[in-house]
Structure formats: C-alpha cells, structure tokens
Regions:
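Short amphipathic alpha-helical segments at helix-loop
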Residues: 7-14, 74, 78, 113-116, ...
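C-terminal/domain-terminus segments
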Residues: 112-113, 149-151
Length: 151
C-alpha cells in the first residue's frame, strides 16, 4: 500500500469518525433538552404521577431537535447569545444529518476537502459541547430551585 493511499485512507476514517461524533453530540443534546423540558414541567407542577412523567418523557425522546427547541422556547427564556447558539446547532445538525455528504461528496476526494470537512465537523462538536454545558448548567440551576422528595 502506498504512503499516499494510506494517508488518504486514514484521513477518510478521521472524517467519518468526526461525522459520527457530530451525530452523537446531536443526540446527546436532544436527550439533554428532553431532560430539561421534563424538569421544567415537574417544577411547574404539570406532572402529578410517575406514570405521567414516564409517558411525557417517552414522548419527548421521540421528538426532533426542532420540536424540542420550539417547546423549550415556550417555557424558558435563553439569553440571546445562547439562543443564537441553539439555533445555529439546530440548523447545522439538520444539515449534517440530512445533507452533509450529498452536498460535500466531491470534497471527500481531495486532501484539502477532507481537511475542511474535518475542521467543520470539529467546530460543530465544540459548539455542541458548549451548548450541552449551558443546558446542563440551566438544568442544575432549576433542579436546585425545586424541592424533589422521594415518595
């Protein structure tokens, strides 16, 4: 195997690894948003039974990121910079999951193209991790404000 072929192969593997990581971060954000919405509803007294909680949680887990973003916006006001990041992640997530390789397939055939794609996916992962941390902070703040007692 030539060095050039091996380099291209390894770089392609790296590209697909970052693509998978971007999808993972997207799913982790969906989970975190579902958690936050359910906690908001618990804090508001909208969940009166464990069965109702489980039912609502299952529904949230089947919602798309867009549905979760719209719903969470009804209950919680994010600072403008966080809302901008949330919208950016939502838009990029949809692009990555639905159109990324359709639109960028030709870039995968060159080293320059693959490097550009890897950098783009790395940036998405960094942005998603930042949003994840912000959502966790808001979730912990709300959790600490409410008094959850085991029954």
């Amino acid at each position: 195997m030539s060095d050039s072929f091996l380099h291209d192969h390894l770089q392609s593997r790296e590209l697909f690894s970052y693509f998978g990581l971007a999808v993972y971060y997207s799913q982790a954000l969906e989970q975190q948003m579902a958690n936050f919405i359910i906690l908001i509803k618990v804090a508001a007294g909208d969940m009166s039974s464990e069965e109702q909680l489980k039912e609502n949680f299952e529904k949230k887990l089947s919602n798309s990121l867009g549905q979760l973003v719209r719903e969470i916006s009804h209950y919680f006001t994010f600072p403008e910079d966080e809302m901008d990041l949330l919208r950016h992640i939502w838009k990029m997530r949809n692009f990555i999951v639905h159109d990324y390789f359709k639109q960028k397939i030709h870039a995968t055939f060159t080293e320059e193209g693959r490097v550009s794609m890897i950098n783009e996916l790395k940036q998405f992962c960094e942005d998603a991790a930042k949003l994840q941390a912000l959502l966790q902070r808001h979730t912990h703040q709300l959790y600490n404000q409410i008094d959850l007692k085991e029954e």
